[in-house]
């Protein structure tokens, strides 16, 4: 089972952006392999990015859109040229400020690239924020 949370840091940053009139831009997904991650427990909304040694991949947001007046979606596609790594933690950030907006704790997943005649896998990840 996966767990999802919008961080308190994002809520504060979003309010700050509103005050200054600057856009709220979430532009990068971060994939990590966090040892001992318990996906059955709720996420602490104060959680930060994992240490650099646990981050296995970063990928730009490829699509975003408004679902309704209270929800937006951000998506990325990890193509067959990306890999090999395993991940159980995904975050959505504003790259310029390094603000972590949303977190998913998930069961361990593999991302394999195409090599030596073996077809890799293609993964799409989408985060819906309400």
What do the PLM-derived regions correspond to, one by one?
Residues 1-130:
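N-terminal assembly/attachment segments of tailed bacteriophage virion structural proteins
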């Amino acid at each position: 089972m996966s767990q999802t949370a919008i961080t308190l840091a994002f809520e504060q940053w979003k309010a700050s952006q509103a005050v200054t009139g600057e856009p709220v831009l979430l532009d990068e997904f971060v994939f990590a392999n966090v040892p001992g991650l318990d996906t059955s427990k709720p996420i602490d909304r104060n959680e930060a990015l994992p240490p650099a040694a646990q981050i296995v991949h970063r990928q730009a947001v490829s699509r975003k859109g408004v679902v309704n007046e209270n929800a937006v979606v951000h998506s990325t596609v990890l193509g067959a040229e990306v890999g090999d790594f395993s991940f159980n933690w995904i975050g959505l950030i504003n790259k310029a400020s390094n603000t972590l907006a949303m977190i998913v704790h998930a069961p361990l997943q593999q991302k394999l690239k195409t090599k030596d005649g073996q077809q890799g896998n293609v993964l799409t990840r989408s985060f819906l924020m309400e």
